[in-house]
């Protein structure tokens, strides 16, 4: 039973030790630096988008294409091909359509990214609460083990509960590590599609 207690504490401590690497973002659980939103200048070197940034939603065809290109289930090579086909068919409207398309991608992917970041921070707060609870129950288990006479039924019940809560904690921790990659993947997708759009404009 002592081995169980030590194992539980090791798992909980390893799952929470890396949090708050940046004091500005105490709920950020990832080893990757938190970048709250993508800078337009970092992904777009084309003509200014000021006059089109709020207009892309008015174009049904562009809105539908933005939705398809933004979906992570659409492979990047397929998305790049769709961009090229759309702009090749745009003829004299190519520059205007290119700007509208990128404005839509920028808005949509930035919004997706914000949702992922907010979700990660929500889970991080839940994990912190779960870790505190597991620590409390581990101390309670240790106290029970030192009581004479021993209440073996109560010790077993609390041990089983700790095992269950620790398993959930571990599973969430693994999911968080996976989801931490998503904002970077979105950044890369936006940069790649922006580059293709700019190349097709030339």
Predicted features by range, described:
Residues 116, 123, 127-145:
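Non-transmembrane amphipathic alpha-helical segments
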Residues 136-164:
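Short E/K-rich amphipathic alpha-helical oligomerization segments
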